[in-house]
Amino acid sequence: MSSIDYLVNNCDYKVSAFSLNDGQRSNSIQPVSQNDQEMCYLGDIDYGCTIIYPNGKKH
């Protein structure tokens, strides 16, 4: 199971989304939403995701 699959299937996880296109990054960490799940799952070339585990570790 990939990290992205795990993220999509576990709502306790959180995601930090940021645009790679304009070089601006969002600092906000939010509960995983449907929009975040779709963005990460699709692997859009314009976006990146940082998966934040409950213990604070990043993957």
UniProtKB/Swiss-Prot annotation:
Protein name (database record): Putative uncharacterized protein DDB_G0292534
Organism from which the protein derives: Dictyostelium discoideum (Social amoeba)
